[in-house]
From Swiss-Prot:
Record protein name field: Alanine racemase
Biological role: Catalyzes the interconversion of L-alanine and D-alanine. May also act on other amino acids.
SMART domains: Ala_racemase_C (SM01005)
Family per similarity comment: Belongs to the alanine racemase family.
List of residues binding substrate: 147, 327
CDD domains per the UniProt record, alphabetical: PLPDE_III_AR
Keywords: Isomerase, Pyridoxal phosphate
A Gene Ontology term for the protein's cellular component: cytosol
A GO MF term: alanine racemase activity
EC assignment: 5.1.1.1
Listed Gene3D superfamilies: Alanine racemase, Lyase, Ornithine Decarboxylase, Chain A, domain 1
Top-level division of the source organism's lineage: Bacteria
Length: 386
């Protein structure tokens, strides 16, 4: 029978592995991004995917304290979690909502849906009529991403429809950049420039029907690279968390990483030369070695693709990870450092002393991208706000 003598909230979340999150860094990053914008240009903090793995409520509060005015999420559930946490600022649901019940929840909780079609507009108006309320919406237009958004050829017609529906209030028109993070700075005739031109052409054609409150196009890359992409509002995700998506301009901005992943050494092993390590024995010791087992694995978000290629930090010094990363554990070679003990803190991502490991490092090893890496840390890793 389970004992209840120790309250769960008394258990140290750092007993095995955890994620550290710095709201101060998020606030500082928001202020740094805010300084790049004209005074009248607003900043939407994109906090989808649980704030890119940092904790959406923590990120939202820090970003709003740093000058963000709006929040962007991908799903209705993400928006509802923020509302239930007491966050009252404008929230845009960036993903498509196709069920009447979802749109009903949107109007009840004062959330703004994204419209990509006439069907969605008519459904929103019908729901708003049933509540005898005005429904604030944004229209998304596809200028080259070929994902969500109204076909550009139908955009004027959709905007006119929304303008004519008495229970809808058009609060924004937006699009999304497809290549802003990969095109060279200042590249002539870039695809980003073409997207901007298409967006501006559309806006100029619909202005007689009334300018929407927000026109927005720029993501983090567009925000950092080109002021001409800012319009009335920018949508910032990755940069909010301390990372520039622009490889050629990575060090040009005062951004602070807001997250670290740490774990503890759980066992020490002294093994002879020619000892196979972990599944498949992909690593064989070439000398008598001291190995440390670390309590974190791919079920926590440490990709198996990093096996035998990554390093970790202990007290500011790098140590190689060896053998296959397993579901719950990985192994590092600490032969040169006998002072490491069970319980020593291992930094897998983040700053330790004068050294650091970044999502860029992991992405270059694994073929992933920083966005995916930050979103990969699972529920088993408690978030510790520092």
């Amino acid at each position: 029978m389970a004992t209840t003598s120790m309250p769960l909230n008394k258990i140290d979340p750092r007993q095995r592995a955890w994620v550290e999150v710095s709201p101060d860094a998020i606030k500082a990053n928001t202020l740094a991004i805010r300084s790049l914008l004209d005074e009248q240009c607003l900043l939407m903090a994109v906090v989808k995917a649980d704030g890119y793995g940092h904790g959406s409520e923590t990120v939202a509060e820090a970003a709003l304290a740093g000058g963000a005015t709006n929040l962007g999420v991908a799903t209705l559930q993400e928006a509802l979690e923020l509302r239930k946490a007491g966050i009252v600022c404008p929230i845009l649901v960036l993903g498509n909502l196709i069920n009447p019940e979802d749109l009903d929840a949107c109007i009840h909780w004062d959330l703004m849906p994204t419209l990509s079609s006439a069907r969605e507009a008519l459904l929103c108006n019908q729901i708003a009529e049933s509540h005898d309320k005005e429904f604030c919406v944004h229209i998304k237009v596809d200028t080259g991403m070929t994902r969500l958004g109204c076909d550009l050829r139908l955009a004027s017609e959709l905007i006119q429809l929304v303008d004519n529906l008495k229970n809808l209030s058009l609060r924004g028109i937006y699009s999304h950049l497809a290549l802003a993070d990969v095109e060279a700075n200042g590249q002539a005739n870039s695809f980003t420039s073409k997207q901007k031109e298409k967006f501006e052409t559309l806006l100029s054609s619909v202005m007689p029907r009334g300018k929407p409150l927000y026109r927005h196009l720029a993501n983090s890359a567009g925000t950092l690279r080109d002021k001409g992409l800012h319009f009335d509002m920018v949508r910032v995700g990755l940069a909010l968390y301390g990372y520039s998506p622009l490889k050629d301009l990575r060090n040009n901005f005062s951004l602070q990483p807001a997250l670290a992943v740490r774990a503890k050494v759980t066992l020490l092993r002294d093994v002879p030369s020619d000892t196979g390590v972990s599944y498949g024995h992909t690593f064989i010791t070439q000398r008598p070695s001291r190995l440390a087992v670390v309590g974190i694995g791919y079920a926590d978000g440490i990709s198996r693709a990093l096996s035998g290629k990554m390093s970790v930090l202990i007290d500011g010094k790098f140590y190689p990870q060896v053998g296959s990363i397993t579901m719950d554990q990985l192994v590092i070679d600490i032969t040169e450092s006998p002072q490491i003990q069970i319980g020593s803190v291992v930094t897998l991502l983040g700053v330790d002393g004068d050294s650091a490991i970044t999502p860029y490092d992991w992405s270059e090893i694994s073929g992933s991208i920083p966005w995916e890496i930050l979103c990969s840390f699972k529920y088993r890793l408690p978030r510790v706000v520092i």
